[in-house]
């Protein structure tokens, strides 16, 4: 029988490294709650980034997935994870930097992603995975609360921005619950939250999403400017484009819905961007 998460970590004399922004979760009930929020089906193929202490890893394995692949860059955790594997042979351990791995490298038809993501690379990973959405069943992720609020934000709200637009064009997004800093050791300075993203059946093409990314970069760089002003350096005839699409050119970036940005991207030929 495996020891508790805390005892298991202590037996390996592993301490969180500040330089890596590490904060450990020892509460197995929280890990179970995250997995429940994912509605993980038996016999799923699951991917976890940054398993660390293995708490979330254990909770996932207890749901009997077909396989769980974990990607861990900190070699201190590999022996601990190997001990978990002795009880769960369907656990696959890859020592690698998550930013250096694409989902296509893992030979998945479809994968469910459940992770407590390292906050310094969380947003980058989310965007990268969304561009490989055809390979993903769904994602249940722990991120900084501020990032989750940006992912889920509606137009005309303070949190709404580029991340909101991109995520909502590719996936259905839902905030599940907040996580207090006291759930971690040591406690971080910010709250965390769990978000679930389910890729849409027919998301826009990657080429279109890349175009939307470029448009929103210009639009939200001048967040308080009218859209006709913030986009004029990118699209000289932006007034005509917005008029044709029946989008009010006095709107600011935060007033346009994700679909409005997609319509602008679709109306522009590649050579115009």
Curated annotation (Swiss-Prot):
Its EC number is 2.1.1.182. GO terms for cellular component: cytoplasm. PROSITE patterns: RRNA_A_DIMETH, SAM_RNA_A_N6_MT. GO terms for molecular function: 16S rRNA (adenine(1518)-N(6)/adenine(1519)-N(6))-dimethyltransferase activity; RNA binding. It is an enzyme of class 2 (transferase). It is found in: Cytoplasm. It holds the Pfam family RrnaAD. Its main location: cytoplasm. The keyword Transferase applies. S-adenosyl-L-methionine binds at residues 23, 25, 50, 72, 97, 116. It catalyses: adenosine(1518)/adenosine(1519) in 16S rRNA + 4 S-adenosyl-L-methionine = N(6)-dimethyladenosine(1518)/N(6)-dimethyladenosine(1519) in 16S rRNA + 4 S-adenosyl-L-homocysteine + 4 H(+). InterPro entries: KsgA/Erm, rRNA_Ade_diMease-like_C, rRNA_Ade_Mease_Trfase_CS, rRNA_Ade_methylase_Trfase_N, rRNA_adenine_dimethylase, SAM-dependent_MTases_sf. The keyword Ligase does not apply. Keywords: Cytoplasm, Methyltransferase, RNA-binding, rRNA processing, S-adenosyl-L-methionine, Transferase. Specifically dimethylates two adjacent adenosines (A1518 and A1519) in the loop of a conserved hairpin near the 3'-end of 16S rRNA in the 30S particle. May play a critical role in biogenesis of 30S subunits. Belongs to the class I-like SAM-binding methyltransferase superfamily. rRNA adenine N(6)-methyltransferase family. RsmA subfamily. This is Ribosomal RNA small subunit methyltransferase A. The gene is rsmA.
């Amino acid at each position: 029988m495996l020891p508790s998460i805390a005892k298991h970590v202590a037996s390996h004399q592993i301490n969180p490294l500040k330089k890596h922004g590490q904060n450990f979760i020892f509460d197995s009930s929280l890990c179970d709650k995250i997995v429940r929020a994912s509605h993980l089906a038996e016999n799923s193929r699951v991917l976890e980034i940054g398993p660390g202490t293995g708490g979330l890893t254990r909770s996932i394995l207890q749901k009997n997935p077909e396989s769980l692949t974990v990607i861990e860059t900190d070699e201190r955790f590999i022996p601990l994870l190997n001990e978990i594997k002795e009880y769960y042979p369907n656990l696959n351990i890859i020592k690698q930097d998550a930013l250096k791995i694409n989902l296509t490298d893992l030979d998945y038809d479809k994968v469910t992603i459940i992770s407590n993501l390292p906050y310094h690379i969380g947003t980058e990973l989310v965007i990268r995975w969304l561009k490989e959405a055809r390979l993903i069943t769904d994602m249940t992720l722990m991120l900084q609360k501020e990032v989750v609020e940006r992912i889920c934000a509606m137009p005309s709200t303070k949190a709404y921005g580029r991340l909101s637009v991109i995520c909502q064009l590719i996936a259905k997004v839902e905030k599940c619950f907040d996580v207090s800093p006291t759930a971690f050791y040591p406690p971080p300075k910010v709250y965390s939250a769990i978000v679930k993203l389910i890729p849409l059946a027919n998301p826009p093409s990657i080429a279109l999403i890349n175009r939307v990314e470029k448009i929103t970069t210009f639009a939200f760089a001048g967040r308080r400017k009218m859209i006709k002003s913030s986009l004029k350096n990118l699209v000289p005839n932006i007034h005509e484009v917005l008029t044709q699409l029946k989008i009010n050119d006095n709107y600011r970036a935060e007033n346009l819905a994700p679909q409005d940005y997609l319509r602008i991207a679709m109306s522009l030929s590649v050579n115009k961007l």
